[in-house]
Amino acid sequence: MEEDKILTETLLSAAEEPPALPFSSVEDIPPITTVGGFVKEFNVEVKKLWYLAGPAIFMSITQYSLGAATQVFAGHISTIALAAVSVENSVIAGFSFGVMLGMGSALETLCGQAFGAGKLSMLGVYLQRSWVILNVTAVILSLLYIFAAPILAFIGQTPAISSATGIFSIYMIPQIFAYAVNYPTAKFLQSQSKIMVMAAISAVALVLHVLLTWFVIEGLQWGTAGLAVVLNASWWFIVVAQLVYIFSGTCGEAWSGFSWEAFHNLWSFVRLSLASAVMLCLEVWYLMAVILFAGYLKNAEISVAALSICMNILGWTAMIAIGMNAAVSVRVSNELGAKHPRTAKFSLLVAVITSTVIGLAISIALLIFRDKYPSLFVGDEEVIIVVKDLTPILAVSIVINNVQPVLSGVAVGAGWQAVVAYVNIVCYYVFGIPFGLLLGYKLNFGVMGIWCGMLTGTVVQTIVLTWMICRTNWDTEAAMAEGRIREWGGEVSDQLLN
């Protein structure tokens, strides 16, 4: 189309050198040949990473706490209310969360690289295109909410829990559409290093959420319906606040208004979004499978209770890893877009070192206090003993799971989602799960065997990702990023999608 050609020429006629970005390097770092040079560049990069990772970690914790706070208040209503909210939050909303966050992660690649190259006008089109795709996905996923009761009954939940969860899930349908707008919007802002404003919005949302939930439960006595109203409202508050921030003009050229271009070249965008979703969901569901398999052991109640405590701790520590994942994804995509391959590679190295140190510190603390911390979660002596026995593998898991998301963040920043999805399938589901079941059931190692086997799958996946990154030609990746940016309107290159 002539209109396409004109816009393409306009984009490509922009200044050849991208403008200096607030937290992107003005030029590529020189080769590092001395210890002093390494320390100097390390200190510079650490500041850039933590400028992004700090607010991202805080934001992850506050948004994670919305559901956690709702569960706490549900426990004051009734046992069945707590069960309903917990199952909806972990199974129904958890499944949708993985799909939506994964599909929204496509913007980390496209917006991050376009921003790094200074092609700001493309970001708004990418954002709108993702809104279209994720809202269509939300319509499909809403069927999961509508039919939650029969689905849960089919997989073995009791009639009482299935019925109560089914009703609460229907109340929570607005949440899935909030996800559809929120995650692309968050990635759009994240790619521009505007994470501080998202952290502030999430903090305000959490404070209001706790106050309003207390009011509708203790004051108005609305029960689970009140919990749903407030939780939906909290997520939509985050969405509206972010949109107001964008529409106010604070993003400059990155948002120039709504455009019909959002409906062009959707299939290429869908392919990258699906690859991102598959990559993330395979990781999220893998951790859920550990508890599922533990439920079929002889002492299922004790095994599941102990493993749930460990997974709860692992979940909170994962918020740190998720924040670092977001930071390194932005840094790598920005630097590749700006044609700074050495800086992108060094940013990865700094992130891996930082994440490893944090993971080791947390793990050592758990090992030191392994005789004390389990009693904070449970009073049953049998469960406490199992948690103590699982602490060493929990410590190893924390270290591995602190590094692995950083490597995945690089994959997103570089646009390797489809390849990593295949790696996850083989490492997790072809190797990890069968090995865990072999150790847990056939060799009678129980819950520890299941977890050890599946952790081995994560270790193999981490090794494969490390091997891929070590073999990467970062100059080639920078050139590929430039090629993607030159595809006007976001038509993703075959190199990105295959």
Swiss-Prot record:
Protein name as annotated: Protein DETOXIFICATION 30
One GO BP: xenobiotic detoxification by transmembrane export across the plasma membrane
Domain of life: Eukaryota
Species of the source: Arabidopsis thaliana
TM annotation in the entry: 64-86, 91-111, 136-156, 161-181, 197-217, 227-247, 277-297, 302-322, 349-369, 393-413, 419-439, 447-467
GO cellular component terms attached to this protein's record: plasma membrane
Any GO molecular function: xenobiotic transmembrane transporter activity
Keywords on record: Membrane, Transmembrane, Transmembrane helix, Transport
UniProt subcellular location: Membrane
Pfam families to which the protein is assigned, alphabetical: MatE
Membrane topology: Multi-pass membrane protein
InterPro entries attached to this UniProt entry: MATE_euk, MATE_fam
Residues making up the signal peptide according to the UniProt record: none
Family note: Belongs to the multi antimicrobial extrusion (MATE) (TC 2.A.66.1) family.
Organism classification: Eukaryota, Viridiplantae, Streptophyta, Embryophyta, Tracheophyta
Ranges in coiled-coil conformation: none
